[in-house]
């Protein structure tokens, strides 16, 4: 297959001297995108691995014609059900439910094809881990053989996958402390669902 990378990069540096003090300053930034051109197989997809986030987890990344390389693939969510009335309203609007016994604190999954069923056809491109923007700066001083420098770098526009479950079902592993912000009752969270195991 092939991948097309496009973007722009810029770096500016200034070096100068004031008496015996040498100093320099630099900034840099880049905007980049990539897209998979053509994967030469029947479905145009290189599938990601399973069991990567936790035991029995499904494929969550892939490479596919027309998408960024290694994009995240899965169900789009629309928050958490806060109460039983929200569940009833969701079902009445003919939105699909993935869970067999949905309860408050469970995730709402978006029914992409509006057929009332959440299935493989509802999985979509959820973004990718490659940043849209990278940036940085550096600052340095040199005076009579002593020098000082600072460097900073950053990125923005990328997605991150976070699993709060332990890998391998290891009973000696714990959830991260982020699980403390999970749903524990109406209005407590709209991002981390209730704990079910």
What residue spans do the PLM features occupy?
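Membrane-embedded beta-strands that build the outer-membrane beta-barrel scaffold
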Residues: 8-16, 23-31, 135-141, 146-154
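Juxtamembrane/interface motifs at transmembrane-helix termini
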Residues: 43-45, 141, 169-170
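Extracytoplasmic gating/loop element in the C-terminal half of outer-membrane beta-barrel translocons
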Residues: 95, 99-104, 155-197
